């Protein structure tokens, strides 16, 4: 009983993260309201990204409500919608700097909430949060470190690293013991290399 109560209390850590995320995305939309798309409207692609955001917030639900298989289904739906919003941006001419940032920050929140779940509900150590915090640490580094340039655009390697990270984190959700942990570790190493590469090219851009 004490262990269950402790887990329940720990899980409340996910809700402040989700609430802060909602507020930060509201600020992002407000600041970027004049440049959603080249036409000025919010756009189909951004609407799909907003749907992704609403779906992934469900990952902050307690494990008694959201089983690993439910979480896997949500992650799969969010990733499929990620493909759709990219297609919509190209098809409807909605591609914009705002849309790119909206998409990247939604991906970052997905990783953060998923790693929080692995830590709080699936028995992983706090080390698993490294992958979830990397994007935010990278942006903070760009702001604070003298001589860094603008954030480098997401490369093909970055997209592949994100996909492999998601596969690894999903392995952690549904595979037992060392199999799940191995997937998470490999995904974390790959995405760390991706951010290191982006940091290097950001330095070159100065």
Segments from the language model and where they lie:
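A feature for the membrane-embedded catalytic helix bundles of lipid/isoprenoid biosynthetic enzymes
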Residues: 1-42, 104-206
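Membrane-embedded alpha-helical segments that form the functional core of polytopic membrane enzymes
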Residues: 15-27, 41-96, 178-192
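Short hydrophobic alpha-helical segments within the ABC transporter permease transmembrane module
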Residues: 93, 101-105
């Amino acid at each position: 009983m004490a262990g269950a109560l402790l887990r329940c209390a720990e899980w409340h850590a996910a809700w402040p993260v989700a609430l802060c995320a909602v507020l930060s995305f509201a600020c992002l939309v407000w600041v970027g309201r004049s440049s959603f798309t080249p036409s000025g409207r919010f756009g189909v692609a951004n609407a799909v990204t907003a749907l992704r955001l609403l779906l992934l917030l469900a990952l902050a639900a307690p494990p008694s409500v959201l089983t690993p298989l439910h979480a896997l289904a949500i992650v799969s739906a969010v990733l499929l919608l990620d493909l759709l919003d990219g297609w919509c941006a190209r098809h409807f001419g909605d591609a914009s700097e705002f849309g790119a940032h909206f998409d990247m920050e939604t991906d970052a929140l997905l990783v953060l909430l998923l790693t929080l779940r692995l830590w709080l509900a699936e028995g992983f150590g706090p080390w698993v949060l490294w992958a979830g915090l990397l994007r935010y640490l990278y942006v903070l580094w760009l702001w604070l470190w003298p001589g860094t340039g603008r954030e480098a655009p997401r490369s093909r390697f970055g997209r592949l690293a994100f996909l492999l990270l998601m596969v690894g984190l999903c392995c952690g959700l549904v595979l037992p013991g060392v199999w799940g942990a191995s997937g998470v570790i490999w995904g974390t190493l790959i995405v760390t290399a991706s951010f290191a590469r982006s940091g290097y090219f950001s330095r070159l851009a100065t």
